[in-house]
Amino acid sequence: MRNAAKALARGLALVVVSPALLSFAIRRAFMGPDRALEGSTQALAVIPGLVGQYLRRAFLQVVLDGCAASAAIEFGTIFSQAGARLDANTYVGPRCHLGLVHLERDVLVAAGVHVPSGGATHGTDDLDRPIRDQGGARALITIGEGTWIGSAAVVMADVGRHCIVGAGAVVTRPLPDYVVAAGVPARIIRHRRDEPARA
């Protein structure tokens, strides 16, 4: 019964977001998918509660490269790159900003996390031109299966599987599997496989 209710809610959510999908399709033709996506997710970001989660997921399942039916996206979260992917059982907390990112299954992203599309999204080499006019390069950031990203972290490099990234950390270099990292810039403070098992 519960699964049937969830399926019905997902179907209704898709119907409700169909005007937003049409608007996205029209704007995408003129602005490109990424600019159109950011505006659409801003509008959907302000819908609170479980209803908002269902509506955001229904929209993102159509417009992103991948968004699992079990993904949860909280209030205030904005996506800026249509190439983003959210695998099964991912959770994105409130007020996050996600660029070109792949969240593998069972990833937890706490409130206020930013994942720009790598660390070189803005060029800075030409001192005679404004930074906004210098372009930049986007890179896919992968956050590995079972990883937990703490509140207000900034992730600009890949994070391995089953990691913990501390609140407020700034990840500038790739992190291997099974580590705990914290600080600015983030440094490995321990290896989870070295910890004794807890009862």
Segments the model singles out, each with a brief description of its role:
Residues 151-164, 169-173:
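Beta-rich strand-turn-strand
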